[in-house]
């Protein structure tokens, strides 16, 4: 009897995308085990640099003995191809941002998100099992009508973070300034406006020799990005740098330049950049929301319900009090050691016991 294929179906496949990185890690594991494995995605949503690394959805044709894994974060053509497949099906749930965050900024996207949340239970019912990348996501999936998801946390790979930093970017940004860093899409659920307001207080009242680097695509929600730019102008706060999308080498540079990593996100399924920042030894301050606490694993600094002045004072203490900073960084390094020692392949084999030949 021939081995089953282990293929993955994605709505899109992009540089710097956490779901895409997860798919690559799983594909590499499956191939290492000796299984044929490909990533299939909608060509309209594939980065030009990755077109040779995946196949179009129209090429997918899984048979009854094959296994199809679908990374679900938005209703898409990939979901349709997945549910119509004859293969045995596994849903991997990456969370769907609640649509209310986008209403007023992008009503069309809000409608897409609402549809995705409404459809996920039906997609899950057509699968033999569902995995969630955090306990928070498993509970969210249950609330949407698909209980009993098994938790398979987002897999961390250090390889992209061990690249040589971008020399030109490092030279451009090297300066005697306390650097606050935030990495992620500029989207309403990230609550970047909260970070900007706290930074304004920090810069004007506590440390004028400071800057805020916002690294991430501004295409996720153009109206929200415009609002953020207007807020910076209204506050007349300097050194707020919208850096846009970062290359892998550029991202390493940003982490190495940072004194603090801050996430004000009000909704996170997990939060991969939190782990990346800890890997680089950057103290992390994050809102206690969604799967953030799971990503931090008891490390970093979690906050909730802070006013801008209070959050600014927290920035100051973590950045300037050496003993506190050393304790935070030590706890983060313990967390990273645990993350790197995680038996990922053992977990995968256990999850796939009923799908692979013994």
What are these model-derived regions, one by one?
Residues 124-166:
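Donor nucleotide-sugar binding/catalytic pocket of nucleotide-sugar-dependent glycosyltransferases
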Residues 253-258:
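Short alpha-helical donor nucleotide-sugar binding micro-motif in glycosyltransferases
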Residues 274, 283-286:
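Short hydrophobic beta-strand element within catalytic cores of glycosyltransferases
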Residues 266:
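Aromatic "clamp/platform" in nucleotide-sugar-dependent glycosyltransferases that forms part
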Residues 131, 171-190, 196-199, 213:
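Conserved donor-binding/catalytic core segment of Leloir-type glycosyltransferases
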Residues 225-249:
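Nucleotide-activated donor-binding/catalytic signature segment of Leloir-type glycosyltransferases, i.e.
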Residues 41-45, 211-229:
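Glycosyltransferase donor-sugar binding loop
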Residues 301-308, 317-322:
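Conserved acidic donor-binding segment of nucleotide-sugar-dependent glycosyltransferases
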């Amino acid at each position: 009897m021939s081995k089953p294929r282990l293929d993955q179906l994605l709505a899109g496949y992009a540089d710097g995308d956490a779901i895409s990185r997860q798919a690559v890690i799983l594909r590499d594991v499956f191939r290492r085990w000796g299984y044929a494995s490909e990533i299939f995605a909608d060509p309209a949503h594939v980065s030009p640099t990755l077109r040779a690394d995946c196949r179009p959805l129209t090429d997918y044709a899984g048979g009854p003995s094959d296994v199809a894994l679908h990374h679900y974060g938005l209703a898409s053509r990939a979901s349709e191809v997945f549910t119509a497949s004859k293969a045995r099906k596994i849903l991997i749930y990456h969370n769907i941002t609640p649509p209310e965050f986008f209403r007023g900024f992008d009503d069309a996207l809000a409608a897409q998100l609402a549809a995705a949340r409404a459809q996920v239970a039906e997609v899950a019912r057509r699968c033999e099992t569902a995995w969630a990348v955090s306990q928070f996501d498993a509970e969210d999936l249950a609330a949407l009508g698909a209980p009993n998801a098994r938790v398979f946390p987002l897999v961390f790979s250090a390889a992209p973070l061990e690249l040589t930093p971008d020399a030109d970017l490092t030279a451009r940004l090297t300066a005697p300034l306390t650097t606050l860093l935030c990495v992620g899409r500029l989207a309403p659920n990230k609550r970047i406006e909260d970070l900007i307001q706290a930074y304004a207080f920090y810069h004007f009242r506590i440390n004028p020799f400071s800057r805020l680097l916002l690294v991430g695509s501004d295409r996720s929600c153009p109206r929200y990005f415009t609002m953020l730019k207007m807020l910076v102008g209204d506050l007349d706060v300097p050194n707020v740098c919208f850096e846009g999308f970062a290359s892998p080498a550029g991202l390493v540079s940003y982490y190495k330049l940072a004194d603090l990593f801050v996430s004000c996100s009000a909704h996170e399924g997990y939060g991969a950049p939190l782990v990346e920042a800890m890997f680089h030894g950057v103290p992390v301050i994050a809102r206690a929301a969604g799967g953030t606490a799971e990503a931090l694993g008891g490390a970093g600094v979690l906050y909730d319900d802070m006013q801008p002045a209070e959050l600014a004072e927290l920035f100051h203490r973590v950045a300037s009090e050496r003993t506190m900073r050393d304790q935070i960084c030590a706890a983060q390094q313990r967390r990273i050691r645990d993350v790197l020692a995680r038996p990922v392949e053992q977990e995968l084999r256990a999850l796939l016991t009923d799908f692979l030949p013994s």
